[in-house]
Amino acid sequence: MSLRKFVSRWNSILMAGALVAGAFVTTGGGVAAAVAAPSDPSHSSQPNFGSNVYIFNPSMLQSQIQATVDAVAAQQVSNQFGTQRYALLFEPGTYGTSTDPLNFQVGYYTAVAGLGLSPNDVVINGSVYVRNQCFSGQCTALVNFWRSLSNLTINATATGLGCYSGEFWPVSQAAPMRRVHIIGPTTLMDYCTNPSFASGGFIADSQFDGTVVNGSQQQWLVRNSKLDGWSNGVWNQVFSGVVGAPAQCFPGVPKGCGPYTTLATSPVTREAPYLYEDSKNHFNVFVPAVQHNSAGTTWGGGQTPGVSVPIKNFFIAEPTDSAGTINDALRHGKNLILTPGVYQLDRTIEVTRPDAVVLGLGFPTLVPEHGIVSMSVESTKGVMLSGVIFDAGLKNSRMLLQVGSGDERGENEASDPTTLSDVFFRIGGATPGKATTSLVVNSNNVILDDIWAWRADHGNGVGWKANTADTGVIVNGDNVTAYGLFVEHYQKYEVIWNGNRGTDIFFQNEMPYDPPSQAAWMEARGVDGWAAFKVGNHVSSFSGYGMGSYSFFNQGVNIFAAHSFEVPVSLPASSLHDLLTIFLSTAGFGGILHVINATGGSSTIANPDTPVTVVSYP
């Protein structure tokens, strides 16, 4: 199939909207009722992570492991808006063989991770895979959200899986792959069922011994990794600090190269914290160190720089714990592990201690009650927040996550930056919800590493006046660096960047589908729509690379946006690189009139599914 033929994907997924919303609601009851949770009595130091964290070790019968992971997949593969959450953790050792591989599917809200200090400490001979989902005969990866793979090696042996040869990871947003070593071919699209559309994606700190097939993935970010080869681009493939990355080529050349945006190094990075088990069977959390101007993996040449924090220094929370209980533990100097589940919060979780770690296992989800802010992080150095979903509640919250109060911005040091890794926001979809802004960053020197802020376009409680949300991300701090900023469907500016010396490497956006009229969606008199990415008028320095914004206005009336990117014309020359807009479907109306300010052509029904690009601005 042509990689440019994305037109019908939006029709198929939206026509199936009611089916999607209904089919993804599941009844209660965990997998443990059918398959006993693995445990090892010899590991007396093993913490209690709750019934939805499965810990495997190589001494277990493979049939037991297979039965457990298959039972989780059977529940989660179609469970898009369910409340069940799981973490599947593998102790150091080898699982499966070339003749009897361990192959299993990863569904919604499932985190698969090795428990070694290095990705090479856990080896799976087989595959840990994702498949297309099929609705009305259309099989795509467009809604393969909220799942992850990390900290292990896969020796890709897909014996007995037919067309599915190698490692398949056809995912969309909020489905990161981190600290993974894959030996053999990897594909980011599921070409075994059609039309195979896909819209991802994020990889970091990983090594691929074999070509990665991008296929139909319309955009993707690879950061600080090592590649043997990369097959192709579609709209916006971005590589930052990647050894073996394709050469810079934007816009793409038909039957030639790209579209690729390639940066030799990443300016400042800090990998996500992760759980591991040491040689004495003691559990710890490893906190990687900050790196500057780096390329390649942190572990390829030896141990990842950083520090280990013993599990005794963590409060291990369960969904039944109140926010008051969690805050009490944080005030007494504990770090925080959030185990799988949905947490109903009657007060804000307050992270106030420097270098505090908040680590989610299995996509824990925070839901505010009474319009509160779900979590606030003080303007202090070194806080690590990773692996958490922030859902909006029934009553409007002014924000869901606040990083820094705004009046202490200098305390977050560049040498020890606060870092948000794999942090996701959702307005509606699972349950009706409202929030004016999802994420507000007031602190300086913050790293944002894989953020998806999504005002739901399908599911429960969805509508222009139902799941209301002005803005996905507001950055007020200086020296903030973002990698993989995915922000979609908000009703005003989707991103507002007010800080100086900020950098965004990769941006993916879809404008809201559902403005009911042009009059209802106007930035100002005479300015149609709202820009997807707004850089504040007073900002004197900002850099952006590989930034795309798409439109699909589906209410049957022409809706236009004057432009997708709005920035001061006084920015230094060539501050922004490789920008694009796209009119997604011939079923849509209106479009985007310019790419950035008044520069760049229009994306309308006259040029559907065709990138309109600006290589450099101003």
Description of each model-found segment:
Residues S2-A36:
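Secretory targeting and sorting signals
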Residues R347, T352-T380, M384, R501-S543:
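Long amphipathic alpha-helical scaffold regions
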Residues Y54, P58-A111, L117-V122, S127-Y129, ...:
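N-terminal extracellular ligand-recognition/capping segment immediately after the signal peptide
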Residues E91, T339, L361, Y483-L485, ...:
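Generic beta-strand/beta-sheet core signal
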Residues S216, G233-V285, G393-L394, F507, ...:
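Gly/Ser/Thr/Ala-enriched C-terminal appendages of enzymes
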Residues A36-A67, V290-A323:
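Right-handed parallel beta-helix/beta-solenoid
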Residues A87, Y95-P246, E350, I389-E488, ...:
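Right-handed parallel beta-helix
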Residues T320-N335, D457, K465-T503:
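Beta-propeller domains
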